[in-house]
């Protein structure tokens, strides 16, 4: 069973080991962390640079074996009542155990009950069907909005999704 706790500085060393190839890196980060490979220092810098912001909440999911997942919740701009998932990733060894679904459900619960959000959003790339199906399984629906990113000289289309309280 998974639990959540706030991200700690040393968590970045474990999290970056889950990003094993360039494709995974860009699906996870949209390139917001620079180029592959990502270092623990670069992830830590990105997270800690925003952690004091009252609208940015990084979490790790853990079980008895240690941390198994990571994500952030943030308020996009000045949109009150809305939080957005970002940097959602699961330890590859934990996949297939329902941990992705559990982690998202815990994050949604935090967003609605602790932070008072009425809507939670996220974006997922079309070329990431396993993540898309996981998001749908916890109740996210497409909201009709999408963006196209130029990643590795290819156009990657994102699908915006949301879940409302």
Per-region residue spans from a language model:
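Extreme N-terminal starter segment of soluble prokaryotic enzymes
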Residues: 1-3
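Residue-level detector of family-conserved "landmark" positions at structurally sensitive sites
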Residues: 29, 104, 121-122, 145
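Glycine-rich phosphate-binding loop
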Residues: 98
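Acetyl-CoA-dependent GNAT
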Residues: 6-12, 17-95, 104, 110, ...
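Alpha-helical segments that scaffold the active site and NAD(P)H-binding pocket
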Residues: 105, 136-137
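C-terminal "cap" of GNAT-fold acetyltransferases
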Residues: 83, 118-121, 125-131, 137-141, ...
